[in-house]
Amino acid sequence: MARLDSRVTVRLARAEDEAGLAHLDAVAWTPASGFPSVMARANDPFFTFFTDDSPPEAHLVAEVDGRMAGYIRLRPVTSLPESAHVLGIAGLAVAPGDRRRGVASALLAAAEQQARARGARKLSLRVFGTNATAARLYERLGFGVEGILRDEFCIGGRYVDDVLMAKHLA
């Protein structure tokens, strides 16, 4: 079980966090947890972490002793009003040196709190079938598997399942 670090604080992202979040994004992902094609964007001189679909206010930042340790991106799963009650976690990253210290748990708890405050009834996410560590964390925090898209991605010549998980909030 992860050791919870009482020094972890979570706050809303600010525009000035962009460079730090881009760096964190570049060092946090591996082919087992993220898409190599997306990871390659860190080398693009025109890459911006924040976009129209993912502005600063869509992100929560975890800090340990005032240093950026992780982030979570929370946004609607679609633009349709019929799914306005569902928010999705569209990215969760923790710096390698800050793993297993409660950073991801703190981010997920803060995202759940924010989702509830925004009136969401369901919080969903997707995780690679190869990322057993993340899947166990999500299950421990009350997320359940809602579907599996078999062989959805081909990463490094290997087919990987896309696992849809969700937590019902109401």
Task: Please give the residue ranges for each predicted region.
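Flexible nucleotide-binding loop
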Residues: 101
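Short glycine/proline-centered loop/turn elements that form peptide/ligand docking sites
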Residues: 104, 108, 130-134, 151-156
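Acetyl-CoA-dependent GNAT
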Residues: 3-8, 12-18, 23-97, 108-110, ...
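Conserved catalytic-core motifs of GNAT/GCN5-like acyltransferases
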Residues: 124-127, 139, 144-160
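Conserved GNAT acetyl-CoA-binding A-motif
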Residues: 115-126
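Short hydrophobic/aromatic beta-strand or adjacent loop that forms the aromatic wall/cage
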Residues: 57, 160-164
